[in-house]
Amino acid sequence: MTLAMVKQPEKTHSPSLIDGLADAELTPEICNLEYWLQAIRCSLRGYVHGHTPGLAVPRHMLEPGPLREASLQEFAFRATTEQMTARHLSHLVRTAPDQATMDFFATQLIDEARHADVFRWHLVEMGIPRATLEARMAEIVGNKRDAILRPLEQFALDLVAKPDADFIGGVIFLTVIGEGALAPAAEMSERKWRVFDPPAAEIAQGANMDEVRHLGVGAEVVRAHIERHPQERGRLPELIQRGLQLWQELPILPLLIEREMLFQAGMEQHRSLLGDYELIPGRRLADTTVEERIGLQAHWADEMRGQRLVRMGLTGLTVAG
């Protein structure tokens, strides 16, 4: 069997999540176990804990201040979400309707567990002792876990953990509602830490390369399901609407504002390090504002969701996310 149908991008010139999802035409059959083994061998080659060996956390990220606090908050939260995603995936592996789909979600489960691990390890690299890491993460994430992540987890468990598990509903949760909705923040993370914290940017880039595959295949699994079961065209959009309505009810915006305000304050302190580095073409990161970066993530969310809905065959669906 040839694996040349889809080539995993080299980490040095990998696409962004946005561009990657626009181009992705992936299936569980293409992204099988052998493909995954070769893909991670390529994308993680030479890396230790998700980044180039010897690439140290810069001194300014080790010193107390808003920039460090922004990073600690972000990576503690992301490590927690990835851990919860891995647990959700165990239900998809258990209930997958065929071998190819089961194998794919098994690889995604390992990917998400790896993401959680490298995010946690970055906190250690930033000076948090391993012995107190879990307690410190719980302190950093705080009530955000109960206010944001627990309701999402319960929404997902209501789909996949019951005896008559809704497998395709669980896939939609990951692809549109849960992991898919978090993807814009992941894209922003890779871009905004590239100068301030190169190890963090490499870690984020590696995770984002995986997410292109996860979201692309997830959309294809839903598309194929709808093709086989056209009667689901009525139920699945309603499920997406309920999930996105839940997002609107959760305190996501205050979390983003808090994180971006810390980043903004840190950026003001260390502006000279950025030079002319651009967040997006034609726009220097040093010139961006809290509102602009949050607005950009909202724009990316709409764009990426639209791409996935088109791929799923749900182009007539109107959602407010």
PLM-predicted stretches and their roles:
Residues 2-321:
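Non-heme di-metal
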